[in-house]
Amino acid sequence: MNGTISKVISDKGFGFIQGEDGQEYFMHRSAVRDGSVFEQLREGQTVVFDGGRGDKGLRAENVRVS
């Protein structure tokens, strides 16, 4: 699924993605395919990811920069 980074809290290692389906997905740094890219993610940046559901709601998996 395509999405846009809506918030990144790099010092805490997570952020949020607004999916093309209108839902907001939690993104942990471990979900970014190339972990070193996490530090370079910026709000408004377009990404591709797999949507999933975790214990606390929607989660982004396999996040990659498009």
Label the model's feature ranges.
Residues 1-11:
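Structural detector for short beta-strands of small beta-barrel domains
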